[in-house]
Amino acid sequence: MSTTVIGSWADAGDEFSAPDITTNPDGTKTVITYRTNQDGKKVKITQKIKEVKVQERVHPLIAQRKNWKKYGKESKSPPGPDTSTTQLGEKVELKLGTSWKQQEKEEEEEKAENRAQKLSVQTIRCRTCGGDHYTSKCPFKDTLGATTSSPAAESGAGDNGPGKYVPRHLRADANGNLPSKEGRDDSTTLKVSQLNSFVDEDMLRNELFARFGPLQRVTLVRNRETGDSRGFAYVSFITEDMAQRALDALNGKGYHSLILHLEWSKKKKTV
């Protein structure tokens, strides 16, 4: 059997008769058509179609507008909007009611509850310098904590009676001194005072000290209760020479309407 190559499916459809449509007792229609598949063979296609009418209830004015006749260049266009000349907007559902005040009140209460939940979240705050780290890991515990730890040392030294427990970190040595943090080198740390209230760590790092060399840390001392700046900070460099250059260049200079005062966090021993 010889097969013919089909150049166009539209031409191939003309070789067969019109579709055979049969109406069934249940109201459906059976449509039988013949086509040629990709292999060049004649196939029979049977389709069973059921027509369903869907009624849509609309406002009488909307139904009246749909029956308006089009005019002008759109006079010959079919019913409905033409996408080439009409831009369809977003469908907006308008809900009317008398409880809008109650809805606004509920929304305000929900916002207030969310704000209260955000404020109730506890943040880490150092009791020594006010930074966002634990008090036990404060980098300036030896410098700022000396005044707060001395009363505890005195009480620990004077209350060594029977039944009194003194924590290890509050026990004084033979000379009456508290144990300090071992292995810590603050020889490259500067204390910067007389800072404006809005100055933060990033401003100190980027605007003042980054040009003198790499920084180990920049800590702005804040109020324990409010979190506001207390007007001074500690800046640690990699080497002592970098810290000395920053001290010589910035001490006594103006910065945001105030005169900076720089000094070593620990006094240098004079030889």
From Swiss-Prot:
Q: Which SUPFAM superfamilies match?
A: RNA-binding domain, RBD
Q: Which residue intervals define the domain RRM in the entry?
A: 188-267
| Database matches in PROSITE patterns | RRM
Q: Its Gene Ontology molecular function terms? A: RNA binding; translation initiation factor activity
Q: Where in the cell is it found?
A: Cytoplasm
UniProt lists the gene as: TIF35
**Subunit comment:** Component of the eukaryotic translation initiation factor 3 (eIF-3) complex.
Q: What is the lineage of its organism?
A: Eukaryota, Fungi, Dikarya, Ascomycota, Saccharomycotina
Name-wise, this protein is: Eukaryotic translation initiation factor 3 subunit G
Which GO terms of type biological process are on file? formation of cytoplasmic translation initiation complex; translation reinitiation; translational termination
Keywords on this record?
A: Cytoplasm, Initiation factor, Phosphoprotein, Protein biosynthesis, RNA-binding
Q: Sites of the modification Phosphoserine?
A: S77
Q: What role does this protein play?
A: RNA-binding component of the eukaryotic translation initiation factor 3 (eIF-3) complex, which is involved in protein synthesis of a specialized repertoire of mRNAs and, together with other initiation factors, stimulates binding of mRNA and methionyl-tRNAi to the 40S ribosome. The eIF-3 complex specifically targets and initiates translation of a subset of mRNAs involved in cell proliferation. This subunit can bind 18S rRNA.
Question: Which Pfam families does this entry report, sorted A to Z?
Answer: eIF3g, RRM_1
